[in-house]
Structure formats: C-alpha cells, structure tokens
Amino acid sequence: MRRKFVYTLWSLLLGFILSAALFVVAVERGWIGYMPDLERIQNPINKFASQALTADGKLLGTWSTSENRIFVATDSISPHLFKALVATEDERFYDHCGIDAKALGRAVVKRGIMGQHNAGGGSTITQQLAKQLYSGKASNTLQRLLQKPIEWVIAVEIERYYTKDEIMTLYLNYFDFLHNAVGIKTAANVYFGKSPSELTLTESATLIGMCKNPSLFNPVRDAERCRQRRNVVLSQMVKAGYLSADSCRMLSATPLELNFHPIDHKEGEATYLREYLRQILMADKPKRSNYRDWQYAQYYADSLAWINNPIYGWCKKNKKRDGSHYDIYTDGLKVYTTIDSRMQEYAEKAVYSHVALRLQPEFDKRKYN
C-alpha cells in the first residue's frame, strides 16, 4: 500500500515536471502565442516621430502617424520619474530578474482566491513592458491567461539584455499618455510644456499616476481624480524611502497645475516649411505617366531635382540596414533646416512692428477716407 502511494506520488511529480517543461518549450517556440525573436527584443520600439529642427537645435514640429513618440535617453529623464515608477509599480524592481514571485503569490491569493480585485496585480515593470511591446489585446479571459506566461519568459529575456535604467527608459518611452502624447518626452511637453529632465516631483508623480489607467486618471478630463492618484504615488514614494512624510504632506496639498497644450501639426512654427519638407523628403522618383500632357515642364523640373537635389526624395533614395526605405513618419529622423530661431524671431517682430506702426494705419486711412 505504501509502495503504491509512493509510486503514485512520484508519477504525479514527474508528470508535473514534464508538463511544465513541455509548457515552457511551447511558450518559447511560440506555439501558444506570439514570441518575439532576439532581434525584436533587442530593438523593441521601432516607431518614432521625425523632427524638424532649426539650425540652432530648436524643435519646429514633428511628423508622425498615430504615435507621436520622440525617443529620450536615460540621462535626459528626471530621476523623480524613475523613483515614482519603482515606488508605485514595482517596489522590488531592483531585486528581481523580471518576475517578482512574492508579488505574484500575493496577487494569486488576494485577487484569485479572496476576490480582492483592488489588491493590485503581480506584474513587474518588466512584465508590463513585455505586455505593452508584444501582447495584443486579449479577446477573452483564457487568451489573457495564456499571455501571462509568455510575458514572464519575455520579461526574463528583457532583463538579460537591458539594465534596470534602460528597462524603465523603454517603459516611459513607449507608454501612451493620451492626447497624442506617446512617450514621456511628448507627454512632458503636452501636459507641462517641459522636457522630461525639467519635471518636478509632483509633475512626475502625476504622469506616473496615469500609468495605472490613463483613461481613468486623465488630468484633463478629471483633474481631482488625477490629483488624488498623484497623492497615492507620493505616498508610495514615502513607503519606498524616496520621500519624507513631511514633504509628502506638503506636496499633496498643492493643486494639480497643468500647462496643457495638445499637439496640432497645423499649428506651431514654420508650418508651411514643414509641409514643404515633408513633400520633398517623401517624393517618389518622377514618372512621366504620373503627369498630364500639359505638365511636361513640371515633370522636367522634378526630374532635375531628383538628380541634382540630394534632399528631393531622400527617403526613397536611401535605405535602412534591413533594405527598406526610410519613412518620415516612423523612423525618428532629425531634419535640420537653415532657419535660425533667434533671427527668425527678430525678423517676425520687426515685420509685426512695421505693419502695426506704419502699414496698418496707412491702410485704415485709405480705407475710410
């Protein structure tokens, strides 16, 4: 009887080990869901807005599709953002290799067994990044359950190839903060009119608070709810040792101060120049069949431009390492113009002054006399 019990126990244990091994193989081979290859893991974000810049480096505007993302490096991001992110989303971020067993176990017990759906999940920052980068939206609960182990494997792979700071930088560069503010650089500008390195502690906490649910904690739609969420982030920073209790109380009492200005590609500086550059850079090689009979002169001029002007059709003349042509909307190009922003500002002020003091009064006098 005892021998039979031991035999059964060992059989179950062996069966469990074999099943687990088979499941891991199935995940790594992509049999139960999409598994990115090494190249995709090493180059996870492949869509960035291109920038039009003045000769002195001032941003005139961007070209993008639905994701107006501009990459920002780790050293150009405020440390407040990193501290707030770790304190709120993954308190043991620096201690695990992609999977936090303690947080996962807590989530299973509280959410799965005790039904406490507000207890928080067990996903680490790395797992959240894996989900954002590689998991599509699940159509049902079963599909979402199958996505989880895939994200665990991807998270471990990400931890192998990136430092902790690089993982957080990828996370912040990828996240969609709504209002066409994709990535932390665009979000800092849209919500506060700043670069990521200039964000204050409360501003950083506001943006990190959105990471839980950007639609729910939208500072434009519901400022008070967003302020409360910001204060939760500040409280978490106290628990993590990044902020004193006195500072937390003082900062929590401050109102939510936004400098919100959504991106509109039809507004801003040098809009006509930006549109001209877009057309020139993305121009195709002229074909006579694409021109009407009476457009021969235009065809001739465009053909000469294609041959003699390196900028004309630049995206179609040049190829990336993979052999595909450049795309101004997704490849993160930097296009420097000959405009000097300071001289341009002086010139515009001079024109406005001349029109207001001289031309406009003369025009009014002739109009009404």
Task: State what each model feature region is.
Residues M1-L53, R92, G112, H354, ...:
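N-terminal type II signal-anchor transmembrane helix
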Residues R3-K4, T124, N140, A305:
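Coil-to-alpha-helix initiation sites in intrinsically disordered, low-complexity, charged segments
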Residues V6, L13-F16, V24, G57, ...:
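Short, flexible segments with low predicted structural confidence
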Residues A21-A26, I32-G33, N43-I45, D56-K58, ...:
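N-terminal start-of-chain detector that recognizes signal peptides
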Residues V24, F71, Y336:
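Short aromatic/hydrophobic contact patches that present stacked aromatics
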Residues G33, T62-N68, D327-D331:
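Short, contiguous pre-domain boundary segments
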Residues N46-S244, R249, E257, H265-Y272, ...:
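Peptidoglycan glycan-strand catalytic modules in the bacterial/periplasmic cell-wall system
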Residues S215-N369:
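Extended, non-catalytic substrate-recognition/exosite surfaces adjacent to catalytic cores, especially
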